[in-house]
Amino acid sequence: MESYNAVTWLLDRNVEEGRGGKLAYTDTVSELTYRDLQKQSCRAANMLRRLGVRREERVAMIMLDTVDFPIVFLGAIRAGIVPVPLNTLLTTDQYAYVLADCRARVLFVSELLFPAVKDIVGRMPDLDCVVVSGKNAYGHKLLSEELARESDSFATIATHADEPAFWLYSSGSTGMPKGVRHLHSNLAATADTYAKQVLGIREDDVCLSAAKLFFAYGLGNALTFPMSVGATTILNSERPTPALMFALMNKYDPTIFYGVPTLFVAMLNDESLKHERGGKRLRVCTSAGEALPESVGLAWKARFGVDILDGVGTTELLHIFLSNAPGDIKYGTAGRPVPGYQVRLINENGGEVADGEVGEMLVHAPSAGEGYWNQRSKSRSTFEGYWTRTGDKYVRDADGRYTFCGRSDDMFKVSGIWVSPFEVESALITHPAVLEAAVVPEADPEGLLKPKAFVVLRPETKREGLDEALKDYVKQKIGVWKYPRWIEVVESLPKTATGKIQRFKLREGAHH
């Protein structure tokens, strides 16, 4: 078997091809050239070896987006060790569950995030040591000191393309997160498809991702894609607020901005930022995580003169497999399959559905993980061999474009017809009074399901007569049976750490 280590392709190739002096990362405090990153990742590999971690064992990362993240992530993979980046917004109980589940030997944690794990690190049976990124080690090891002790050369482990390289835990919008095992070959698979053939990523690009590196989306945006061509990435360790995103755009002038729908909405709607223009070199924006409403895409294009390429990806498939493309955009749809991916829509019996009919999406993906860790039945029902089940329902139009209808468990039938919560929400947020909306099924007095809407109103909105106005508005936009029978005004909507609406929480509250 021919050996293949993802770091040789992602990092060392850039140095060998003459880009060693090029800026790979800046996190507003530190900068790393590709050569710096190569040396530091070798130090990290040597450190892990010294700490007694063996090939294929796991090391967990609860790390903010600073230059230390790629150093640790790539250093582990270089040593044949499996890094497991974790969501930085989990609870202490969730961290205890995941650290036990992945049996991490070492935990790398940012100084600011250490309080979330301080009470549990002593009782994790497999955890040998904690390494803190920052200035205060809290009595544990300090990453900067540990790296400084090591040599900056390391004989990269001759792993294989089909060997586990890293794990990502799915965001668990329903239940506890599941560890998805990704292979060395999966990283290049996303770069050769979406990055190369949809984004057209280039060496002179400067990338800014609102999504953090621990997300599959963020990892591609800010590590795999830029490093695949020797581009530069701006890392931001803070929460991506509209003001901060515009400040980073003004300072670094990125060419690619990767966002999510809730952030695009907030950036468009912040009155104090109406003068912002998003930098001079911006050539393309991307959106994923949840479907981008048509009204948002059109408003963004009108103001900034740049398209948002809306696409769909999952943790299991590592990055975007359905996307709009430059020169081929239809806002309100997820576009077409990314070159290199195949998709099909099936009904409850496994048969193909016709254009215009709702079906569950299956994907054949070169970037699919090999399964979940310690979850055999869930692995078998998701990773079915050639096809991977997404658990999402879509409809395909005559032009071969796909429109998201909802998670399979978010969809519901009204009068025997499927209703997509997303379609009703998209209609509601085009109304001038509505900032955000979420729709769930609610039983009427006869026990039949009908749509119920939770809405966040714009400031200064008058409530009088609004419920009826919104109902009539939706009827006119998308059809009589889809309008929300009940409307509840709320201050905010429950969301995951990724900004996805947690409809199941609203559903639990709706069924009185």
Regions found by a protein language model. Give the residues of each.
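Conserved AMP-binding/adenylation subdomain of ANL enzymes
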Residues: A188-V206, A216-I256, D270
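AMP-binding/adenylate-forming catalytic core of the ANL superfamily
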Residues: L90, L107-V109, F257, A365, ...
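Conserved AMP-binding A3 loop
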Residues: T33-D36, I157-A158, A165-A189, G335
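Conserved AMP-binding/adenylate-forming core of the ANL superfamily
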Residues: G21-T66, P70-L74, T91-A96, S144-E145
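Conserved pre-ATP/AMP-binding loop-to-beta segment of ANL
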Residues: G21, R149-Y169, M176, G200-V206
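ATP-dependent adenylate-forming carboxylate-activation enzymes
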Residues: M63-L64, I81-Y97, E111-V117, A231-Y252, ...
